[in-house]
UniProtKB/Swiss-Prot annotation:
UniProt name for this protein: Modification methylase StsI
Function: An alpha subtype methylase that recognizes the double-stranded sequence 5'-GGATG-3' in one strand and 3'-CATCC-5' in the other, methylates A of both strands, and protects the DNA from cleavage by the StsI endonuclease. The 2 domains of the protein participate in modification of the two strands.
UniProt KW Repeat keyword: yes
InterPro entries documented for this protein: Ade-mod_methylase_MStsI, Ade_MeTrfase_dom_2, DNA_methylase_N6_adenine_CS, MeTrfase_D12, SAM-dependent_MTases_sf
Pfam families: MethyltransfD12 (PF02086)
Key words of the record: DNA-binding, Methyltransferase, Repeat, Restriction system, S-adenosyl-L-methionine, Transferase
Organism for this UniProt entry: Streptococcus sanguinis
Subunit structure: Monomer.
Length: 653
């Protein structure tokens, strides 16, 4: 979610400040002004975390992702016959004749353009259903907040605004015409009693204590309640009367003193004075309401040793878009020791028992691999045999398919050794630690979606000393997030300006993928497909093949996806290979296209027909997942040498 003052890009600096002054004995981390819980969620891997915010929609998110430690089971809903609540909510049908509160409030039905009429109707019916389940006692507390936060997180992606809700756009932005899609969360289980609060920060600090307190108050006169009133209204669901063109509720009780000149300094002094903690870290900005000098004086007054550690970070380093270089704008990080303690320094490491879970039906590869089958999984996987002993993905690529298959043993094979080296590295790293390594590398090199010089320097560094971690980081800032190499196996994909970066979605996909991967008995091999040794495979095993497509023009990640070229000769080798599998009674499934942009793969069609194979037609136009390229008029197929209902081998010719 785009959020004013989000500290996502500042996390490495905050972590450095914490590590500099703590000794590893600290247990509780309090985020007093949590917002979207970016900081709280990051530090959950190290500490028991308390999250607080005066806005209720922030509290909802904290209940779902901070206080909650596990993937919701939805056991009562399942008993009631609803196997997947997220899917159920997503598929609820809107009634054109029914006009709900949110439709009148935020759509053209009520003369507002925040949401399309369809999405506002969808919001009404989903919000109502979640509340109904709660009232029927079909949801636990955390299940309720999980579903509600999933809905709230979805709204910015289809809102007709510039990012906040101070006003809506006169003309409809393209993204606002997309359908509302509920957002899944990745949940960290740190086995701690984390807590979420929804209180005034100045009052809360007088009631609780923590070892580390992080403060990120508003800097300027923009009030968060008015800028995010739509999300707050949906979270509270009290249906208040709305006023004015902007359709805002009476938010006076949510007005922050920290965004009010004349009150901010007094409020800050009161806050610091009453905090019961050993360490205080404060984020601010040198153009904020409170001057740097005044902040320093307050902190010095309440520092146990009179010392204030100040770190100035150039503002443009942590922005997604460039700001004028003539502006001397800084993010400020202040640290004071509030109470005395005996420092016995130990390395602050992620908790060993942090676990990751998600409610997503399918795990998505952390790689954007051209030709990936993630969007086809719901059609492909039901056609795969059950009770697979060894699953072999012979053109594994980004491993979207294999990671979602149920089997006893897995072999992922691909010619691209660099990709396989990366996956082998992922197998050895704790998921949370892996993300931390990536974020530290990004910070070390100053990588961002606007800093091309840093990208080029890092690419040169990688090509001099290639390693799997750097390759993944490099791809995260590359054009279309892709992996491309020249004939010397040097990475040569250009910079992905203004788009490519290590996003929250990438982070969650990586965490979920690596967590799942490390539960599998999986091996990664680097063979050409017809050199793969399948002598130990039996009829209880299964081979999936997703080769380059003969009649499409997709340029694969390494130029030719590890192949010098894919032509009729390559296709014949593939068909002969599958004939050999067939003769040895090994079940296989082949993904391919028989038609594409007026072209026909007659070779493949004739081969499948002559062997009496099962051709399953999939409801999907071939799309190579490129941001700038969409193909039409394709027929995607899954060809199997077994019956897809009984999974028995066919009587092939």
């Amino acid at each position: 979610m785009r959020y004013i003052g989000s500290k996502k890009l500042l996390l490495p600096e905050i972590k450095k400040m914490v590590d500099k002054h703590t000794d590893g004995s600290e247990e509780v981390f309090l985020d007093l002004f949590a917002g979207t819980n970016v900081v709280a969620n990051y530090f959950k891997q190290f500490y028991t975390v308390y999250s607080n915010d005066m806005l209720f929609f922030s509290y909802v998110n904290a209940k779902a992702t901070i206080e909650n430690n596990s993937k919701p089971s939805f056991s009562k809903l399942i008993q009631a016959g609803i196997s997947s609540p997220m899917t159920y909510l997503q598929n609820l049908e809107v009634n054109d004749e029914t006009i709900g509160y949110y439709e009148v409030a935020y759509s053209p039905t009520g003369e507002a353009n925040y949401l399309s009429v369809h999405n506002a109707k969808k919001l009404d019916i989903i919000r109502s259903q979640i509340e109904s389940w709660k009232n029927q006692n079909l949801l636990t507390e955390h299940e309720y907040y999980y579903l509600l936060s999933s809905l709230i997180e979805a709204l910015p992606f289809i809102s007709n605004t510039t990012g906040t809700y101070g006003a809506f756009l006169k003309h409809w932005d393209k993204r606002s015409l997309n359908d509302l899609e509920l957002q899944d969360f990745t949940i960290f289980d740190n086995s701690k009693q984390n807590k979420a609060f929804n209180e005034d920060a100045n009052e809360l600090v007088q009631k609780i204590k923590a070892d580390i307190v992080y403060i990120d108050t508003p800097y300027n006169s923009r009030q968060y309640a008015s800028n995010y009133h739509l999300l707050e209204n949906v979270a509270r669901n009290e249906h208040p009367t709305l006023k004015g063109i902007t359709k805002i509720f009476d938010w006076k009780n949510l007005k922050s003193d920290y965004a009010t000149k004349g009150k901010a300094l007094v409020a800050m002094r009161d806050l610091i004075q009453n905090i019961n903690s050993t360490h205080i870290i404060l984020s601010y900005n040198n153009e904020g309401i409170i001057s740097e000098e005044d902040l320093t004086n307050i902190l010095k007054e309440f520092s146990v040793d009179g010392i204030v550690d100040i770190k100035k970070i150039p503002y443009r380093k942590y922005q997604s878009k460039n700001v004028s270089k003539n502006k001397e704008i800084y993010e400020l990080l202040f640290y004071i020791q509030r109470k005395p303690f005996s420092k016995n320094k130990t390395l602050n490491k992620p908790l060993n028992n942090v676990r990751v879970s998600s409610t997503k039906k399918y795990i998505k590869s952390p790689l954007n691999y051209i030709g990936g089958k993630y969007k086809l999984l719901n059609q492909i996987l039901p056609l795969f045999p059950k009770n697979i002993n060894t699953f072999v993905d012979i053109f594994s690529g980004g491993a979207n398919v294999g990671i979602n298959v149920k089997a006893k043993k897995y072999i992922f094979n691909d010619m691209n050794t660099r990709i396989n080296e990366m996956f082998r590295y992922f197998q050895t790293q704790p998921p949370v630690k892996l993300v931390q390594q990536i974020e530290e590398k990004i910070d070390e090199w100053g990588l961002s979606k606007t800093n091309e010089d840093a990208f080029l320097a890092f690419r040169k560094h990688y090509n001099t000393n290639p390693n799997p971690l750097d390759l993944y980081v490099l791809s995260s800032f590359s054009y279309n997030y892709q992996f491309r190499f020249n004939n010397s196996m040097e990475f040569n994909n250009p910079f992905g300006r203004n788009r490519s970066h290590f996003s929250e979605n990438m982070r969650n996909n990586l965490l979920n993928f690596v967590t799942k991967l490390q539960t599998l008995d999986a091996t990664f091999t680097d063979n050409y497909f017809n050199e793969f040794d399948f002598s130990n495979l039996t009829s209880n095993d299964f081979i999936y093949l997703d080769p380059p497509y003969l009649i499409t023009t997709g340029s694969y990640n390494d130029g030719k996806r590890g192949f010098s070229d894919w032509n009729n000769t390559s296709e014949m080798k593939l068909l002969n290979f599958m004939d050999y599998l067939n003769q040895h009674g090994i079940r296989f499934a082949l993904s391919n296209v028989t038609e594409h942009k007026g072209k026909t793969n007659q070779l493949l069609k004739d081969w499948a027909y002559s062997r009496n194979l099962n051709v399953n037609y999939l409801d999907h136009n071939y799309n190579n997942s490129s941001h700038n390229s969409k193909s039409k008029g394709s027929q995607e197929v899954l060809i199997t040498n077994y019956e897809t209902k009984t999974f028995n081998l066919l009587n092939t010719k």
